[in-house]
Swiss-Prot record:
Pfam family, one: Ribosomal_S10
GO biological process: translation
Molecular function (Gene Ontology), one example: tRNA binding
Keywords of this entry: Ribonucleoprotein, Ribosomal protein
Role of this protein: Involved in the binding of tRNA to the ribosomes.
InterPro entries with a match to the protein in the record: Ribosomal_uS10 (IPR001848), Ribosomal_uS10_CS (IPR018268), Ribosomal_uS10_dom (IPR027486), Ribosomal_uS10_dom_sf (IPR036838)
Origin organism lineage: Bacteria, Pseudomonadati, Pseudomonadota, Gammaproteobacteria, Cellvibrionales
Protein name listed in UniProt: Small ribosomal subunit protein uS10
Gene Ontology CC annotations of this record: ribonucleoprotein complex; ribosome
Length: 103
């Protein structure tokens, strides 16, 4: 797998969960002899929702909710066969979306 690069994008709603998963991937890749670039924190997406509290009148009474999506980017440079096998067997926490691309 010479001149290959594995790019891993992680998404989660909980920043502690995404940091723990990122650290686990970095440790696994370094243990198998690959070089890791990152983790690079990407911009956090904040979605805000405003909901009327009253079912009929009182337009001034509203609740506001926010959901944050945290993202991280990892590049594994010059991965070995052991690196790919270890990453495939890695069991990450539920709630973390993982996108893997070869480049």
């Amino acid at each position: 797998m010479q001149n290959q690069r594995i790019r891993i994008r992680l998404k989660a709603f909980d920043h502690k969960l995404i940091d723990a998963s990122t650290q686990e991937i970095v440790e696994t890749a370094k243990r198998t002899g690959a070089q890791v670039r990152g983790p690079i924190p990407l911009p956090t997406r904040k979605e805000r929702y405003t909901v009327l509290v009253s079912p009929h009148v009182n337009k001034d009474a509203r609740d506001q909710y926010e959901i944050r999506t945290y993202k991280r980017l990892l590049d594994i440079v010059e991965p070995t066969e052991k690196t790919v096998d270890a990453l495939m067997k890695l069991d990450l926490a539920a709630g973390v979306e993982v996108q893997i691309s070869l480049g």
